Amino acid sequence: MRWPPWASDTQAQQQSRKSSSEDDERQAAASSTTTSKKKDWESSVTAIDWAAFTEARTIIPTLILTSGFLGAFYIHRRYLRRFPDAVSITPSYFRRRSLLGQVTSVGDGDNFRIYHTPGGRLAGWGWLPWKKIPTSKKELRDKTVHIRLAGIDAPELAHFGRPEQPFAREAHQWLTSYLFGRRVRAYIHRPDQYQRAVASVYVRRLLDFPPFRRRDVSYEMLKRGLATVYEAKIGAEFGGEAMERKYKKAEWWAKLRGVGLWKDYRRNKTKWESPREYKTRMGLEEAAQPGVEIKK
């Protein structure tokens, strides 16, 4: 306010200072109030409401999501995990579980390769665009499981400089026509020293009678005289004593009828040679050559 002309300068100055001091106090009080409100707001924002984590609306969805994730992981690891080769098969499969796959090649009368298709058609193999089974050798390289049929020994084809055994080609051709391109189930017993999985293999075929009946491939070969019962004392796998007796009975019946490799057995017993005897003889002949491994 304006002071009268007769007022002294000292009174005017005192009043001005008093007014200025009051303004400063009001501003300080307002600033303090604002700061306090800001701190209260920040505290409310950053504070953790621990009680909310114990409420049912929080616990139930969390349990459902966690259980679903763990369940999906377990199912994938146990049922949908694909093995690219025999070396990758975990020990939990040996003598307990099986592999489902499609036969991509047949190397001999008692071994072949499958492309592992866990879950089969139910998991999309063969009809989903991203689950097609490769067909070319380049695509299949390092992606197939090498299977050795359990319980049998088929005649040897010519390889590693060794001559072909009688009925080796017939056994190979039959196994190729019986399995190539088909889905098989292999019950894994163990791995062998050649990075193969020794397995009892079963297949279902439309043209068999009765159709789609599960067939034991090893048994079918023994019955037709295309293989002998595995004779090695170490490393023999049959899938149990009952299967061993069944295989020996099938071999005895084929020998009695003189079918397949048993055709000339009675007339020429002294020169007849089983696959086991053939490999033993070849091994003895190659004993002088270091680094040569005898195939089992």
UniProtKB/Swiss-Prot annotation:
- Domain (TNase-like) spans 97-264
Q: Which domain of life is it from?
A: Eukaryota
Localization (cell): Mitochondrion; Membrane
Q: What is its EC number?
A: 3.1.-.-
Where is Ca(2+) annotated to bind? D153
Q: Broadest EC class?
A: hydrolase
Residues at the catalytic site:
R148, E156, R196
User: Which UniProt keywords are listed?
Assistant: Calcium, Endonuclease, Hydrolase, Membrane, Metal-binding, Mitochondrion, Nuclease, Transmembrane, Transmembrane helix
Q: From the UniProt entry, list the residue stretches annotated as the region Disordered.
A: 1-36
Q: Which SMART domains match?
A: SNc (SM00318)
Q: Which GO terms describe its molecular function?
A: endonuclease activity; metal ion binding
- Primary location: mitochondrion
Per its UniProt record, what Pfam families does this chain match?
A: SNase
Q: Transmembrane ranges?
A: 59-75
This protein's GO CC annotations: membrane; mitochondrion
Membrane topology designation: Single-pass membrane protein
User: Which spans does this entry mark as compositional bias, Polar residues?
Assistant: 8-18
The family annotation for this protein states: Belongs to the LCL3 family.
What name is this protein filed under? Probable endonuclease lcl3
Tell me the organism: Aspergillus fumigatus (strain ATCC MYA-4609 / CBS 101355 / FGSC A1100 / Af293) (Neosartorya fumigata)
Instruction: Give the classification, highest ranks.
Output: Eukaryota, Fungi, Dikarya, Ascomycota, Pezizomycotina
Q: Which gene encodes it?
A: lcl3
